[in-house]
Amino acid sequence: MKRWSVKGWMISLSFVFITGFAVAVIPSAAVTAEVERQEFYVTTDTGMKLMLVAKIPASGRLGKAILLVHGSGVGWVYWDIPIRDYSIMDYLAKKGLDVYAVECRGYGKSTKPNGMEVNATTTASDLKSVVKEIAKRSGVSKVGMAGHSSGGAILLVAAGMYPELVDRMILIGAPYKKIHPNFVAYATKVIEMGKEPGKDYVPNLHYRDVEKRLDAYDDDVVAWYKKVVEEQYGLMPAGVYPDAMKNPGIPIVSMTKVPTLILNGSNEYVVDPQDALDMFKDLGSPDKAMIILPGGYHLMFIERRGSAGLQETMFFWFTKK
């Protein structure tokens, strides 16, 4: 697989808004350092027990820690795909970052409350304890955060709740005031399923024909993804979708001063393109950027070009001075 530099991605964009940084100085450093894997739990002030996985560089640490927050359809695992060079966690850790991925409430090995109690506000409240624990373990005062899809709304709410703990922020495939018209029917179906009595967790169906909504991909990676979702995340909390449609993070966008990158694929079908532009314009932070990765869909983690673009762009933003 060809490794693309962030510079190359930016040059090939159909459009990009950049504020406060020069494209030409972005290095493409080699991935060489060894990493240590850790798995642990954090009991939050909100009463949740959340599982975290960490990848810590054995040497060459840059003194920065980041937290990766998943979206609605799968837990933490797509940040660490164990096939060839698809792991975002490995890539970032080998370049010197302390990398943590959380399993949010309602998912995987973490506490599963009533599914209607899983939303951006409750999850952001949980993550305050997580961010504090990460800061303690890594010896930093602030933690960078990346959130995918509904995880973006979680980050916005977190940036409003405890901005003093958030270093830099990346919103990947995260809607703002509306979702893409192509995704409305599926979102509506999920919301309606959650209205049935006793259905606070609903079937997760989005993964079944995911290859129809991907840029060039490797069969074994897509097969891995489908197997993981089917075996570990076959049900998802019913509270996520109705909350995401309302997006409690909307008021935070214009208020936040946290440096923020909006990162989408050019073939996004969850994020509406004009909505993404509106969010960029409304962002209150003077240090902000929007990058569109050519050919990428919503799940760029499992795409050949998309995974490489995510890795290098994320490293750039989290280490930008």
Residue ranges and their predicted role:
Residues 59-62, 66-94:
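Short, surface-exposed "cap/lid" segments of acyl-processing enzymes
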Residues 296-307:
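Catalytic histidine-centered segment of alpha/beta-hydrolase-like enzymes
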Residues 31-59:
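N-terminal cap/lid segment of alpha/beta-hydrolase-fold proteins
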Residues 124-141:
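Conserved acidic catalytic loop of the alpha/beta-hydrolase fold
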Residues 86-111:
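Conserved alpha/beta-hydrolase
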Residues 141, 146, 150-177:
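Conserved hydrolase catalytic core segment
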Residues 269-275:
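Conserved alpha/beta-hydrolase "acid-adjacent" motif
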Residues 184-263:
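Alpha/beta-hydrolase
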